[in-house]
C-alpha cells in the first residue's frame, strides 16, 4: 500500500451510516482519498434512485444540476449553485452564493457559508466553512473549522505534483497535481490564513489568523497558546 499519513491518524471514526465505506477507509493513506471521491459518488448514485435524492425543499432560484443528493432538514439558500455529482447529508446549512462545483461529499450538520466554493472535496460531520472560503481537493475532519477568508490552496505555482510531509519530516510523493489541505478532527485555521498545497493538520491543531502554512502540524507540537493568542482566535 502507498506510504503516507493514514486516515485513522486524523479521524477517530467514520459515521456508522456512511455510504462510502466500500471506497474510503481509515486504513488508506489520506491523500489517496482525493482521487477516490469521484468513484465513491459514482457508486452511491448508481444505487440511489432519482426519486430519493432530494429530501429538502429547493428554493426556486437555487441552481441544482447533475447527480445531487440533498438530505433531510437541509437549510438551502435563496440563490447559489450546486453542480453534481454532490452529496449533502441531513441538517446541513448552505448560505447565499454557495458554489458546489462537483465531486463534493458533505456529512451531517455542516455549514457551507456565503460565497464559499467547494470542489472535489470531502467534509465529515459538523464541519464549519462559514465565510468566503475556498476548499479544493481537500478533506476536513469532524468538527473542523475554517475562519473567514481562509483559503485551502490546491495547486503549486510551478504546477508540479504535490508532496506531503510525514510527522517525522519525511516527504511523500502523492503523485497528485492538485491537492489542497487535510484537516483532522477538530483542527482549525484562523481568518485569512492560507494552507499551502499538501498541508496537513492533525486533530485539534491550529493555524493562526493570517498565517501562511505548509507542511504538517501536530497538535501536541504547537506552542502553548498565550492569552494574546487565545484572544486572536476568538
PLM region descriptions:
Residues 56-225, 229:
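Structural signal for interior beta-strand "rungs" in well-ordered beta-sheet cores
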Amino acid at each position: 500500500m502507498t506510504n503516507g499519513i493514514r486516515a485513522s491518524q486524523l479521524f477517530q471514526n467514520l459515521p456508522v451510516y456512511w455510504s462510502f465505506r466500500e471506497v474510503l477507509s481509515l486504513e488508506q493513506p489520506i491523500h489517496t482519498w482525493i482521487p477516490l471521491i469521484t468513484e465513491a459518488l459514482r457508486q452511491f448514485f448508481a444505487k440511489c434512485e432519482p426519486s430519493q435524492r432530494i429530501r429538502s425543499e429547493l428554493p426556486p432560484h437555487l441552481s441544482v444540476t447533475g447527480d445531487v443528493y440533498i438530505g433531510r432538514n437541509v437549510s438551502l439558500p435563496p440563490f447559489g449553485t450546486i453542480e453534481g455529482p454532490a452529496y449533502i447529508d441531513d441538517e446541513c446549512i448552505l448560505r447565499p452564493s454557495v458554489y458546489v462545483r462537483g465531486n463534493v461529499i458533505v456529512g451531517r450538520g455542516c455549514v457551507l457559508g456565503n460565497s464559499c466554493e467547494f470542489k472535489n472535496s470531502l467534509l465529515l460531520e459538523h464541519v464549519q466553512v462559514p465565510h468566503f472560503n475556498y476548499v479544493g481537493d481537500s478533506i476536513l475532519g469532524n468538527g473542523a473549522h475554517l475562519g473567514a477568508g481562509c483559503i485551502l490552496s490546491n495547486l503549486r505555482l510551478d504546477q508540479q505534483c504535490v508532496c506531503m510531509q510525514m510527522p517525522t519530516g519525511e516527504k511523500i510523493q502523492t503523485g497528485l497535481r492538485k491537492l489542497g489541505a487535510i484537516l483532522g478532527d477538530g483542527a482549525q485555521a484562523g481568518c485569512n490564513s492560507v494552507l499551502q498545497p499538501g498541508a496537513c493538520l492533525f486533530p485539534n491543531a491550529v493555524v493562526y489568523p493570517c498565517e501562511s502554512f505548509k507542511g504538517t502540524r501536530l497538535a501536541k507540537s504547537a506552542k502553548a497558546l498565550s492569552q494574546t493568542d487565545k484572544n486572536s482566535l476568538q
